[in-house]
């Protein structure tokens, strides 16, 4: 059975790179959204349909809603919403900023000087074993 993941990221390049790493570890169905509001809507829809997400992966700096500018607080805002409304859903922060969020399942610094791919793989493997 495929791991169902929602990925909140406004960069197509980062989305492709992260998806490639995920699919090297688990069979995954990855839904990609580029803003917080659309992500929350998709999470609600998935729950209503009886097919909730197994994991959310979020950037830190992207739009809060469609057609808006990127917001540096978007990732933290998303993690807060998930903690309040969807506590069952683990969140991995994967950002070009080396930021830690204590409410996230894990944080990955997306940077070429860091083994971000190995870090993400390890988090996915650990979560898949649960």
What role is predicted for each listed range?
Residues 11-15, 61-67, 97-100:
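Short acidic, S/G/P-rich loop/turn micro-motifs used as interaction or catalytic elements
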Residues 77-101, 106-108:
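A short, hydrophobic beta-strand element within the central beta-sheet of small alpha/beta folds
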